[in-house]
Amino acid sequence: MMGTFTFLGTGTSQGVPMPACSCHVCHSKDPRDKRLRSSGLIRLADLTLCIDAGPDFRYQMLREKVNTLNAIVFTHEHRDHIAGIDDIRAYNYINNQVMPLFAPKEVVEALHQSYPYIFNSNYPGIPKVVLNEISEESFNIEGLTLTPIPVWHHKLRVFGYRFGDLAYITDAKTVPDSSRRLIRNIPTLIINCLHESPHISHFNLSEALAFVADINPGITYLTHISHLFGTHEEISAKLPPNVHAAYDGLALSFNTHVSDNL
């Protein structure tokens, strides 16, 4: 079965443009240089789910005309990936549904700490959720199998996800060999690449390209991009033919079937 992955956002935690910044990237007229906080949308015939729900979640759902949302899967607990959770109320009201959330233990704990009113009260109008804690084992959401890909964001564990022949990894600095084996030779790889300078918790360009060389994917898209990296055109000029800078709204096709070669 074929599905579609759409980049809801491809920016860093501050987004692009960044408030008060006078750089040429933040003032670019190219729509590809308008980067909301990083997240993704998976669409199959009878399934729509998000990876992360950051502070731009509401606008991203409006932009992509997401009228039905079956679940949200979280990568980690940083605010640029969870801060939009309150806006799931629209789906509670309009679709008369409780929203399933899938998250590793650290995210489950952070959601309880950051949004106690969701879990500790019956106040009218609060988001209605079912919080499912996931491990590093594969799990299934209405027929789609997702395999967590544990990576390290400095000292913070983050889950990337493989679904079919596509892997999505954000906020990675170190990727263990056990995780690399899950995605080696995958047809489509999405990874974070902040900019060219070294960073404590994100791949820079040289690290991202070294990772690509090791994984040997068919094609790679870079996400979680900083304004310090340059404009979309400037970034693209620095990349080899099989690596591309993603941009908000870009849609990719993927096959839910996993090849025996993976």
Place the predicted regions along the sequence by residue.
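Core dinuclear metal-dependent hydrolase active-site scaffold
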Residues: 1-51, 55-64, 130-181, 248-262
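Glycine/Thr-rich phosphate-binding loops of Rossmann-like dinucleotide-binding domains
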Residues: 15, 59, 82-83, 199, ...
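Active-site neighborhood of divalent metal-dependent phosphoester bond hydrolases
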Residues: 95-99, 107-131
